[in-house]
UniProtKB/Swiss-Prot annotation:
This is Pro-apoptotic serine protease NMA111. InterPro entries: PDZ-like_dom, PDZ_sf, Peptidase_S1_PA, Peptidase_S1C. It comes from Pyricularia oryzae (strain 70-15 / ATCC MYA-4617 / FGSC 8958). Its EC number is 3.4.21.-. Gene3D superfamilies: 2.30.42.10, 2.40.10.120.
């Protein structure tokens, strides 16, 4: 069913190797691929134990979670469990090493009076957090972060103790001094807030280096404890307690290779942070931008540790077997050119040092001051003075969102991971105008509009001065490959995302405060430009070669996902059908709806805006338009043939491949057939139905998503289009079919548009498929009709059967409409043996039909429905989900509409994602009140106070009713209404609802929304070398 698809926060580490403690920067991935360490590794946050079902939960229950076997342990556990809470949380947007996600974890109360809860830093996250805690008696309370450590894996949440009414709240004492090798411990955690998990183990190590989890957040410059406890998903942040009921460590991670090894964070630094909070003191954190590792004496000897120093260290610390060794020194940091990799640390401020805990103490107490380090380098003593920096100053606490992307200063975490200087502008959400290639993050900006952007302040000033709709050059590097400078051109969107917003962390409220930095500058008026076209060589038909002047490159960018469409950006080649009016025909797999920006490139030189003029409801093409006055180029109008192309006919194929290069060849039409594009069951989206498809005898046809079939005289006989199909369950990629569409079917529509008339098509609300005469005879078609079919269509002896009815609003079941299984014989006395003959329906309100139903021949008067009402013209964004009327693809696949409020998409890290409201759900009630349409739904949800629970009654696509309770969050996910309005420059206008009041325009708060379409598509639509060709 539609339960939450949250990820349980339990960090896992890969199997052991000889590189057990080496950071991944020392290993280079092959062919620039994403680094996968052969040693310690963990999936990114949004890959933790996704979508656990009942079997998964049972498997977790069967882990060795043995209960206490003594009276002492029973008493201890009974006392501890009341302090442990289950944390359900959202990291509401991508920030630093954390992706936007919804997850569950554990924490425990460490100050009952003030309401402090200790958990992991990878739970609290470095960015915006929104969550709540569930206590052992299932009382719930909101929680917000008051501290997250810049480096170590702990954070502190705050809650209101007065909100817990039905149980006493007690704190679990922190006793880091009681952690010893051989101590028996219990890891007490909550699994999904429902099942108590008590796992037993024995501490086996106190001196393990912090595990490396690969790309993403990792702890460092601390030791970890090790035990065998087999902790499971959701156990991050669990207290590790001894038999006396004291917390001796914090559960932080474990192995992912099946071993039951778990890693615990020592509590020395969490205890200090807690005491600072209790005393109202700042939590100072010092660092010299050098990562140390614990290395045993034998390895230190190989690095040059002198025997006399080893003797002195062993005498001073008889139980120690390790020393601190410099592993990574960041360029341009305090340690740069002073400390070198492989240096063995002996003293800090004349004090012998062997432990991370004491090193942290000294650095945290000397922020802004110099410290003296005594190092052994190749057997020689080296003494250096290093300035201690402020860790908080190199940990981002703000981000800027503009033009659909998000940016902040490069963090110490990222800099340490890749061994680079801790400076630069990091793209934490590479979306909107700043979508670079196929990776969503990891980019460091170098220049924008030929201006350097070394820091966030400079970035803000540069972007402020770029007008809306400008195209500017951007250079950038990826942290995994700083040797390569990438250059691209971006289209700056400051109309869909008009505000430049600064979000700053507020540790007093636990929220991130939003501020408007600048309004968008108006776009610069376009000016006419000249261009010429390439010459198509090696063709014997000059008229065919001239057709390159009829092709234009089209990029369609969608600010919001509607109608189940899986992408935010598509590109393809369009065919100019009227150069004087600037009309272009293109596949609806490229331009799916009109809430979009369209850029048209002519002659690989002139870039102009386009707009949607017409979207065909069935035949997979759209007609868009540009302003021809801006184009001074010999654009040629393609001549569309009025005669149907036939099977076996010779033709010329001109197509554009995946990188936008033209290819051409002489070929033959192999087949013309009524195509049945498979429906996408996971999330219905536009697909072509009731249309003939053409295939040709050339391998080039499968490589090209755009093109034409041309007669020798240059007449276009068919368009070559991309048809969006189903999603492959094995690869999670969207299937695309490349097929031809004969041009005669376009001519009536094109003629009306050329005359300035908006086509008002009508259609039969059914989907047909062809059947052969053997099937038709069995189903009751008479021999007389079969004979007429053989005479009417000598190339294909076929009739058409209704396979699916499209659900129409207010349609009477007994109105004479077609039913599944009906065989169509005639329409308006015309025998129908070709799919193109169905085009008669586009211009008639009623059609006289002869059909065969259940072996009986019937005459019907078939009503057609208006096709101009099938496109989405109204949408609502609420709690991170997109709602609109069920679009045509939904009605094609469903037999009953439960309401006019349909969930089309949702955003990761949002309330809709956390509480399990999934795409393809229908909303029928809000707090028990019927919401049959968007108007009543919007009125109901805007009346709900912020941060309060409400009930949604939903029905799944498979007709299963269920109820979801959600909590409203307007701060990060405001309610916005999108209304199609031709008077607006963009064709749509927005209404934002804040505190139940409506106001025009974009919301002043809210994180950048990156919608996830059902099924989790793999975005394989790689743009060309530049965003705009």
């Amino acid at each position: 069913m539609n339960g939450p698809t949250s990820q349980r926060a339990k960090r896992k580490q890969g199997s052991a190797s000889s590189l057990d403690d080496r950071p991944p920067k020392h290993q280079r991935a092959l062919n620039g691929a994403k680094q996968q360490s052969t040693g310690d590794n963990t999936p990114e946050e949004d890959m933790y134990d996704q979508g656990l079902d009942d079997e998964d939960l049972l498997a977790q229950a069967l882990l060795p979670s043995v209960g206490p076997d003594t009276v002492e342990w029973q008493a201890t556990i009974q006392k501890v469990v009341s302090n442990v809470v289950s944390i359900r949380f959202c990291q509401t947007c991508s920030f630093d090493t954390d992706a936007a996600l919804t997850s569950e974890a554990t924490g425990f109360v460490v100050d009952a009076e003030r309401g402090y809860i200790l958990t992991n830093r990878h739970v609290v996250g470095s960015g915006p957090f929104w969550g709540y805690c569930i206590f052992d008696n299932h009382e719930e309370v909101d929680a917000y972060p008051v501290y997250r450590d810049p480096v170590h894996d702990f954070g502190i949440l705050k809650f209101d103790p007065k909100a817990i009414k039905y149980m006493p709240v007690a704190a679990l004492p922190l006793r880091p001094d009681l952690a010893k090798v051989g101590v028996e411990i219990r890891v007490v955690g909550n699994d999904a807030g429902e099942k108590l998990s008590i796992l037993s183990g024995v501490i086996s190590r106190l001196d393990r280096n912090a595990p490396e989890y690969g790309e993403g957040y990792s702890d460092f410059n601390t030791c970890y404890y090790q035990a065998s406890a087999a902790a499971s998903g959701g156990s991050s942040g669990s207290p590790v307690v001894n038999i006396d009921g004291f917390a001796v460590a914090l559960q932080a991670g474990g192995r992912a290779d099946g071993a039951s090894t778990d890693y615990f964070l020592p509590l020395d630094r969490p205890l200090r942070a807690l005491q600072c909070l209790q005393q109202g003191k700042p939590i100072t954190r010092g660092d010299i931008q050098c990562q140390f590792l614990l290395k045993p004496f034998d390895e230190c000897r190989r690095l040059g540790l002198a025997p006399e120093w080893e003797a002195q260290m062993r005498k001073a610390f008889p139980k120690e077997t390790n020393l601190l060794v410099a592993e990574i020194i960041l360029p341009e940091g305090p340690s740069s050119n002073k400390v070198e990799e492989g240096d063995v640390l002996l003293k800090v401020n004349e004090e012998l040092i062997t432990e991370f805990i004491r090193l942290d103490d000294i650095l945290d107490s000397n922020v802004g001051k110099p410290v003296k380090l005594l190092l052994q380098r190749g057997g020689e003593d080296v003494e250096v003075e290093v300035d201690v920096g402020d860790l908080h100053s190199i940990t981002p606490d703000r981000f800027v969102s503009v033009a659909g992307g998000s940016f902040h200063s490069l963090s110490y975490q990222q800099a340490r991971l890749y061994g680079v200087a801790c400076k630069g502008v990091y793209v934490c959400e590479a979306t909107g105008s700043f979508r670079f290639e196929t990776s969503d993050n990891g980019w460091i900006l170098q220049t924008i509009d030929n201006k350097k952007v070394p820091d966030l302040e400079t970035f803000i000033q540069v972007v402020k001065n770029i007008p809306d709709k400008a195209r500017v050059v951007v250079t950038y590097k990826h942290l995994r490959d700083l040797h390569t400078l990438n250059t691209t051109i971006i289209y700056v969107d400051r109309h869909w995302s008009s505000k430049m917003k600064l979000a700053v962390r507020n540790d007093d409220t636990g929220l991130w405060d939003f501020t408007d930095l600048a309004d968008a500058l108006p776009p610069v008026p376009p000016v006419p430009r000249k261009a010429s076209f390439i010459q198509l060589e090696h063709t014997s038909h000059p008229a065919v070669a001239e057709l390159v002047r009829s092709f234009v490159h089209v990029t369609c960018t969608m600010p919001m996902k509607l109608d189940g469409f899986p992408k935010n950006r598509k590109w393809g080649m369009g065919l100019v059908i009227d150069a004087e009016k600037g009309l272009v025909v293109i596949s609806r797999a490229i331009v799916p709806y009109d809430l979009c920006d369209i850029s048209i490139t002519i002659g690989e030189s002139i870039v102009v805006e386009g707009k949607v003029v017409f979207l065909h409801p069935l035949q997979n093409y759209a007609i868009i338009q540009y302003d021809p006055k801006l184009v001074d180029a010999p654009v040629q109008s393609a001549k569309l043939s009025s005669e149907e192309i036939t099977q076996g006919a010779s033709t010329y194929f001109i197509g554009y491949n995946r990188i936008g290069r033209v290819v051409h060849t002489a070929t033959t039409v192999t087949e013309i057939f009524a195509v049945a594009i498979p429906a996408n069951s996971g999330a219905p989206r536009y697909r072509a139905v009731n249309v003939d498809a053409i295939t040709v005898d050339t391998n080039l046809s499968g490589q090209c998503g755009s093109g034409v079939l041309v007669a020798p005289d240059g007449t276009v006989q068919a368009l070559w289009l991309t048809y969006l199909g189903e999603r492959s369950p094995s690869t999670h990629r969207d299937e695309e079919y490349h097929l031809g569409l004969a041009t005669p079917t376009l001519l009536p529509v094109v003629k009306q548009i050329q005359q300035g008339i908006v086509p008002k098509l009508r259609m039969l609300s059914v989907e047909f498929r062809s059947i052969q005469m053997a099937q038709a005879r069995i189903m009751g078609v008479s021999e007389e009709w079969i004979q007429q079919v053989s005479l009417a269509n000598t190339s294909h002896h076929q009739l058409f059967m209704v396979t699916k009815r499209t659900f129409e609003r207010d349609q009477d079941e007994n109105s004479g409409a077609l039913l599944e299984g009906d065989i169509l014989l005639t329409l308006n006395d015309k025998l129908i043996t070709r799919i193109s003959e169905l085009d008669i329906m586009y211009s008639h309100e009623f059609l006289g039909a002869v059909i065969v139903r259940e072996t009986k021949e019937l005459k019907l008067k078939l009503p057609t429905v208006a096709a101009d009402d099938v496109e989405t013209d109204h949408a609502v964004s609420f709690c991170g989900a997109i709602f609109h009327r069920p679009h045509q693809a939904v009605r094609q696949q469903i037999s009953k509409l439960y309401s006019e409020v349909y969930v089309s998409a949702r955003t990761r890290g949002s309330p809709s994602y956390q509480y399990g409201l999934a795409p393809t759900n229908f909303i029928t009630h809000v707090n028990g009140k019927r919401t049959p349409d968007l108007k009543t739904f919007l009125a109901a949800v805007t009346a709900i106070p912020d941060n309060t629970y409400f009930r949604l009654k939903a029905v799944t696509f498979d007709s299963v009713p269920w109820v979801v309770t959600m909590k409203k969050n307007e701060h990060y996910f405001p309610t916005v209404e999108w209304i199609k309005d031709s008077s607006e420059d963009c064709g749509w206008r927005r209404v934002t609802y804040e505190g139940g009041k409506a106001m025009e325009g974009e919301p002043s708060e809210g994180v950048p929304a990156v919608e996830e379409e059902a099924g989790g598509a793999v975005d394989d639509d790689v743009p060309m070398a530049a965003v705009e060709k």
